[in-house]
């Protein structure tokens, strides 16, 4: 069985992301396994400029729509009971999780 598990989390809502990270930290603290992280990765900003007037007559006015993607990485020891508890964590719809066994 692999020794470590790498958990990657990303979301557009930083509050929901921190909520899930705190749940994972609570599980790790209760079980006593080693943990490294959460490591915040750079926030990716995506901008889409859109012209307000679709026909293009008159002044060209632009609106900018922006979305930020926040990411975290957590490395933990891959203990069987910890992994079972991680599968039971309630995750909001806008938070995505990827677990990789290293």
UniProtKB/Swiss-Prot annotation:
SMART domains per the record? Ribosomal_S10
For this UniProt record, give its keywords in alphabetical order, as a comma-separated list.
Ribonucleoprotein, Ribosomal protein
Provide one Gene Ontology biological process annotation. translation
In alphabetical order, the GO MF annotations are:
structural constituent of ribosome; tRNA binding
Kindly list the GO CC terms recorded for this protein: small ribosomal subunit
Query: According to its UniProt entry, what is the function of this protein?
Result: Involved in the binding of tRNA to the ribosomes.
Indicate the family of this protein: Belongs to the universal ribosomal protein uS10 family.
| Alphabetized PANTHER family for the sequence | 30S RIBOSOMAL PROTEIN S10 FAMILY MEMBER (PTHR11700)
> Record's NCBIfam families?
uS10_euk_arch
Could you describe the subunit structure of this protein? Part of the 30S ribosomal subunit.
What is this protein's record name? Small ribosomal subunit protein uS10
